[in-house]
Amino acid sequence: MATGEKKPETEAARAQPTPSSSATQSKPTPVKPNYALKFTLAGHTKAVSSVKFSPNGEWLASSSADKLIKIWGAYDGKFEKTISGHKLGISDVAWSSDSNLLVSASDDKTLKIWDVSSGKCLKTLKGHSNYVFCCNFNPQSNLIVSGSFDESVRIWDVKTGKCLKTLPAHSDPVSAVHFNRDGSLIVSSSYDGLCRIWDTASGQCLKTLIDDDNPPVSFVKFSPNGKYILAATLDNTLKLWDYSKGKCLKTYTGHKNEKYCIFANFSVTGGKWIVSGSEDNLVYIWNLQTKEIVQKLQGHTDVVISTACHPTENIIASAALENDKTIKLWKSDC
């Protein structure tokens, strides 16, 4: 059930229309976004673990420790359906590029591929020997990559459900896996303190990113253009890396992240921001270039474990743990 938020009159009056002269092709990043709470989505009965917008922008998928996936309208927060079948809690969910399929990663040691329109499980991917924690489709959506507490990364064939490769990737649980934009590379992160880049075709490790220190790496993803890698570590830090040079370019701090694997995002529909949840129950938004905190979103009553940015609109989805169990949709003018 989604509940709408009323906008105070004064706030609406402050939102002046932008003069048309500034409507150039490549807009400079505005000073600050103005994300405001629009909807609160309630339905999960345990901690929410992950939220992801469909690539076509229509839907939001959420996964939870309650073993369920829920689908919601991306623009109105309207509940659409529940997808069930896992025996234990789900840590992650991801969409195929055509927005027709979902893959989920569960503590029951399996991944499942779902047809979203029917809610049917098409394939169960078996092979990991411990909790499956993270998953993603490649852009072509013929492959799935998964990471597990068994310390391995696996590459799966979507059509057959067979495991094509098992990478002995890390020496501790794998916290995140992500393909770059042409699917040729995979980045993985782990509690062992490493970020590794893999050649998808051969399964070879091409690069290991190491900084001075090596706190557990709790999340990683490629930037939309594939040149950079955003990595979160459990010392309250997000870092932007130049992948080819193996150099850290930017550091984002001010949030709290010492315990949980919290998702982070590149927001590119308006200004260029970095977005992350936090253990102080807030959503943090940084200016990507200047590294300044430009907004903090207040409303959740527990750790904000997951955030997602809409593919075309200035919309953020956020989700929180056990004491909250809700998903919130926020919208900004820039």
Swiss-Prot record:
Lineage, highest ranks first: Eukaryota, Metazoa, Chordata, Craniata, Vertebrata
Recorded name of the encoding gene: WDR5
Keyword annotations from UniProtKB, A to Z: Acetylation, Chromatin regulator, Isopeptide bond, Nucleus, Repeat, Transcription, Transcription regulation, Ubl conjugation, WD repeat
Protein name, as recorded: WD repeat-containing protein 5
Subcellular locations according to the entry: Nucleus
Organism: Bos taurus (Bovine)
N6-acetyllysine PTM positions: 112
GO terms under cellular component: histone acetyltransferase complex; histone methyltransferase complex; MLL1 complex; nucleus; Set1C/COMPASS complex
Ranges of biased composition (kind: Basic and acidic residues): 1-12
Primary location group: nucleus
GO molecular function: histone binding; histone H3K4me1 reader activity
UniProt crosslink position (Glycyl lysine isopeptide (Lys-Gly) (interchain with G-Cter in SUMO2)): 7, 27, 46
